Amino acid sequence: MLEPPNHQTTAKTDQAASMSIQLLLFVDERPSSHEYIQPIRDYIKTVSQDCPCQLEVIEIHEQPHLVEHFRLVATPALVKVVPEPRQTLAGSNLVNQLKKWWPKWLSSLEENHHDSLLEKSSNVGYSGELMRLSDEIFRLKKDKENLQEQLKFKDQVLAMLAHDLRSPLTAASIAVETLELAKNQDPTEKQQKLTAQLFNQTRNQFRVMNRLITDILQASKSMNAQLQVHQTEVFLPRLSKEIVEQYNDLLTEKSLKLIQDVPQDVPGVYADEELIRQVIVNLIDNAIKYTSEGGEITLSILHRTSQKVQVSVCDTGPGIPEEKQERIFEGHFRLQRDQGKEGYGLGLSLCRKIIRVHYGQIWVDSVPGQGSCFHFTLPVYR
């Protein structure tokens, strides 16, 4: 014989389900990141008698869209999605932070429980079907943004081909024609110096074109597919030394001095070495391009915090106006002072993509007439 449902028991069950703290723990592939999972689970187990808690562990390489959705800047990170408002905890002491905030979250959950049914239903947040719908809407928005970026990128490439690539090609062509006219003349000392200068100019222009083509190809690859990131422990002092050595001839040619402030005890970073090499090369290329003969360039590396290492490339060039300092990272944005040069091109836009995929930051400090300093951060390998 079937017994009638116990409405009181059902109500209690529904009440318990609604009064549940929901947490998302974001971790990366580093062993040190996974070490936080069990201590957090152990603490939640000890306090779950007071209130049920739902903990979901998310591998950031499997769901990168959620990392961007919650605007995370470091891992591991613990995100409280219910009760509202959303809150993010990050750092090396997640368990202590959780102990501090748990009583406040319980209090907030109890207050929300006594609100209207409509308000409570809105606080269900990111569970079940609503979570899936939210993710789907977010993905569709990202797809739309990616398509718009690709269309914009095509316009940028056309603009680059029309101006940036044509300018060095014209200069190299003029130099070659001048050499051809001078080849049948008697080689005087003055003509020999001129010939050497023309060869040097031609070589520099070909170098500019090669860099532009490399930027276009790499940027095109990153626009049409996700950057392939293979993160390992990278030692920046060794990497920076390798990069600087390849600039010796160019620095001598422009009478530039490159100062390195790179402590050898800087901890390793968690990064893709080739992508970070590309960022540093791009920043040094720009510094050399905008620094006049006899100027100075500084490459420095600083262990900024226990979790971050900062790399800086500074020059004594003309500087960048404050209102333009953010826009130079927006693809093919051209400063007024770039009209006589090949411009920043797509390089800085690509640098920002690379640093963001490493959960770092990139920015510029500059005063017109006093040079520029480009900085970026990377997570310490643990």
Swiss-Prot record:
Domain Histidine kinase as annotated: residue spans: 160-382
Catalytic activity: ATP + protein L-histidine = ADP + protein N-phospho-L-histidine
A GO molecular-function annotation: phosphorelay sensor kinase activity
Top-level EC class: transferase
Modified sites of kind Phosphohistidine: H163
Enzyme Commission (EC) number: 2.7.13.3
One Pfam family hit: HisKA
GO biological process, one term: circadian rhythm
Cited Gene3D superfamilies: 1.10.287.130, Glutaredoxin, Histidine kinase-like ATPase, C-terminal domain
Function text: Member of the two-component regulatory system SasA/RpaA involved in genome-wide circadian gene expression. One of several clock output pathways. Participates in the Kai clock protein complex, the main circadian regulator in cyanobacteria, via its interaction with KaiC. KaiC enhances the autophosphorylation activity of SasA, which then transfers its phosphate group to RpaA to activate it. In addition to its output function, recruits fold-shifted KaiB (KaiB(fs)) to KaiC to cooperatively form the KaiB(6):KaiC(6) complex (independent of SasA kinase activity).
Assembly notes: Homooligomerizes. Interacts with KaiC. Participates in the KaiABC clock complex, whose core is composed of a KaiC homohexamer, 6 KaiB and up to 6 KaiA dimers. SasA and KaiB(fs) compete to bind to KaiC.
HAMAP family: Kinase_SasA
Protein's name in the database: Adaptive-response sensory kinase SasA
